[in-house]
């Protein structure tokens, strides 16, 4: 219950009376026998109440709280009207008898009491100023909160005394409790009287003298025991009488206090107020009757029959003829708005009548007691429906206006949004709580300011402009051509409005373009990204949309089983709940009938518009990304960021699509109607998916061209494949395209591996023939053979890694895609159906797919979720992550036929057994409809279950069908892609075999022609090592490729497997020496390969081939093992040494990469980091051994060579891990692809100094020396003698004593220097509050010197700029203050941070962020690599964009003013030449007329003054281009000219700095946009951020 309602008086009267203070004194007497401590003074209670009432008041303080759980009353929004509070409290009292009821605050007063209740009570309220109302409400709420806390702390009497003392003196007459009042219900009630009732004695009087003493004692004891165990009826009656008396007097006193307060507020006596209330209550039956018979009176509004009302709302997408469209069109839109406005005013008036009626009673129970119709069910339903309609209509109207403000749209009615003006600032008498309004305002501010803040700096800047774009700005941007692109289509938003697509008409549809959101979308994507944009829009709109959706759901709609889960893949964006809260489900059952009876207009149009606006904003993001696609082929350095943006917009678009469908599926009665107006959105989603696929194909092709392409390639492909599996099911036709694309990519990897092998062999052969043609000495020939052998081993090793990654990805594709087996009917369809019926199969009926025949086993008939998962799996959805347990025996049979007539002829259309109806998702139905199924498919969820289910099905239906494909995909396009992938894998087997033959042929010819007998044995050793490495590669590849094959491909790979084994055995018999009784280590992998031959491969051989293979195996094994004591005739053994693959200079120090393990490819799955961590010592030893082997000639050791001894030499930088070379290379390592050389820096061979690495300016070295000096000072202080220690102690004691005396004002303090803070304050600068100590000088510029500085309090290292000036030099102080003002206004991670200033008489100290890695000019002296240039350029462009958006022109952008930090960030600083523009929105060139800056970086308009017009922000863009040239070449532009006047002359004559040739095409295009001579054509910083040159990933995903 709310507080006691005072007599309705106009709001001006409230201001005259101390209502805020007396609000706490209002009682709200419940009819229950407990007191309310918030309602009456404690002194009055102690006088009137008994001890029991006081105890009950103290017993349960929680029940007297003002805050009640109001969520369960109406369900659409918290019941915040005083009427709603009363109804909730009355219901609470009925449900919990004997518990005190709580009150809620009365927010507004009613109209004057003299007015008739039938008059329009809203007119008097409209005259009140909104400002005074809000101020009064805030003061009252604050006072209530404070005093309530005091009451709960047992300070009630003290607070009442203080409040009473603060009130104006006014006589309050005494109230007679026994006096009857007309307006109080307890006055005529009969007072309960409790009198002691004599109880008749029934026991017979017995003479005690007749009983013995022991018997008498026994009798007395028995009587006492019986009395103790029984409850006295007398005491029970007396106790009940006392409770009734206390409750009566408590309720009576509360009602009298309420009457007294009503009289006090109205300025009447108690008797006059009593008479007034009695008279006013006579009109209550008429008010109740008017509410019960209320129906909206539209008066003179002529509306057509197809208006959007609850009786018959027009369904979205309803078709009309063009004539109806033109006739009904806009008139229906304006008519709906008029209906909304009229209905809102009338409902508001009827609710005010209800408030007026309830204000005449102290509680709702008292009102219900006098008028039973008020408590009737029909009255409650009617009032609840009115509250529901009023709350949701007002809420949706407000959210539409908020969205218009956020999106920068002012004239909402021009674009067809159903927004109407609310005539009063308080239309529904406070129906919406203040907290909700304030929360909405906070969310709006967050959304507007969110586009200005970065991820690193969540606090918005005070100078950030609001994200509100005027219509003029939109029209300007539209006229500039940024909207009319080739992908732009006219898509009206009228399809989201409840009165249909055609109703807007041609006049309104021309305004309904999604391009009106373009300025907002462009800015939001750049400044906070799509993910934050979706999160904030969802936070702003989701609550209102959910409440409206629950109210619009029709309960009489037939419910069919359908699978519509929340998007699990979007859980990091927003959480969608498939079921609304239970408290919100209660409203629609009552509301719909009542709303129809009252002829209220539907709020469905506003709901549909809001849902569509969210979808259209994301649609515009899709369009923007499509238009920003680079025209040419993107480079490797920018394609990663482009792929990342594609994935982000695809994920966001699908999330918003599912949210839109979730909101509208039950409102519009089915997803078919929801999908009918999303064709344009679906088309753009498909286009974006195709763009993503093109980027992926280009990316993999570029990576394959790198020398070390095998590193991390599989991880990249797995990540992209997992993402594609999640999203493609929700895009039309996406599953088949995705499967085909990734099969092509895997085949492309296998083909490129073969090409890499052939090109490497071609280079080796060419080098060998070149060395042979030189006719050099034997030493040169030997060196050439050794180098080529080593190169071949590296070639086979890299080809092995590439093939391993490609095969691993191909096997993963096969596991995910091959989930079906294809059968061909060998009998008629009738026989098959009879067999299925005999096996108790169940047919699955899908509405709309009558030509698709689906059968499942009888065990799955009740498992509809499993059937839906099987259907999803058949269409390509990844079901491996579903939380439900997967049935091992779950499968379905799928076949499809053309028309129903043919089905009836073939027998497919006749099924007389059991059938079950399933309604899948719309995407599943679309895919099933477009699938081509020629034969019968058996589909399972996972490929691991396919073999078992296929064999079981074949046995059950034996003789009726034959297997065509044992394992294939359910979609023909993917099945063809998998077949092509297997053919590519078989082709690589042939290319590996050909490569080994080529190496054998190459070395055989060389040795036969050129090598002498004495050198032949040594060179044969290297030749055999290369051959064994090639064979080992072939072994591992053949063993792995077998696992990829199925069906007829297994027989093909079996033939190649046996052929390769025969090739190896022949090589061993002809080129290798016989063994000595044990198996040599080099033959281990060959023997393992022979053991892995499957019996199926051998069984397919003809008898002659099998016998020859058997004989060859026996001969090979005998030759390799040999006899224990075979003599060694040669100086060196001819058997190959244990193969050691020499590490490439870019390989990680991993022992597994040096010596291949017998397990083959399986060891490659271990991450290199994990392998390196535990084997660093072994890796170092292996590296040393490899280096020794590579440097020297092979020693005579035979097959089992002795490991090389470690040599104490200088550390090899190539053998170590990543050396600490250039800092730029370490930053670039995060951006570069993992397979790039880890020692690609030109400075990799440099030795690092013992002291900390320094930059060219020596700033880091000096700071290191400063820290060393401080540590030495501390060490010297610790070595003091006893005398120094005593003196120091005395000095510290004196300082503490003086400090304590100064604190007590006993002594003063002499100031050495006068305070100059007044000078700081008048310029408004931030002064430092920390103690600091100056360090070394690190630089000197035009305006002062720069030192390092340490904060004594925190130890933080800062930069301190010292500026000296003459005393009273106000000009210098003002110029410096202007620079600091520019600093203070902005806080961004790419701008140097400003801490404060300290001003003295002749100098000023400016404290700034210290950038410890020097300037960009210093690190660019040797030129930078392009990926680093791109990273730095992006950060500089972001910093310039932030300055320009704040209206600041830097005017001195150059390498010396751009600073680097150890974290890799670029920071733009030195704002000495910057200027703050007066007009932020102005973007024209002529903004500044002074010439400042550095000549080499000056724009032409700065030098020429633009013929008197001045220059603007475009000058910074020219300087940015000059900085990029400096990073590329290492020299500033125009470095060949010595004087500034020469440079100014060249630039002024229209010459541009030459663009470096070694820059990529994207970089050259970027520079051409920066170095435009005409500033009007030159791109802005915002446009440059969309260029492909700066599309780099600044952080790892």
UniProtKB/Swiss-Prot annotation:
Gene Ontology terms describing biological process: chorionic trophoblast cell differentiation; intracellular signal transduction; male germ-line sex determination; placenta development; positive regulation of JUN kinase activity; positive regulation of p38MAPK cascade; positive regulation of telomere maintenance; regulation of gene expression
Gene Ontology terms for molecular function: ATP binding; MAP kinase kinase kinase activity; metal ion binding; protein kinase activity; protein serine kinase activity
Record carries keyword rRNA-binding: no
Top enzyme category: transferase
Ranges of biased composition (kind: Basic and acidic residues): 1241-1250
Modified residues (Phosphothreonine): 440, 451
UniProt feature, compositional bias: Basic residues: 84-94
Active site location: 1452
Protein name per its UniProtKB record: Mitogen-activated protein kinase kinase kinase 4
Top-level taxonomy: Eukaryota, Metazoa, Chordata, Craniata, Vertebrata
Gene: Map3k4
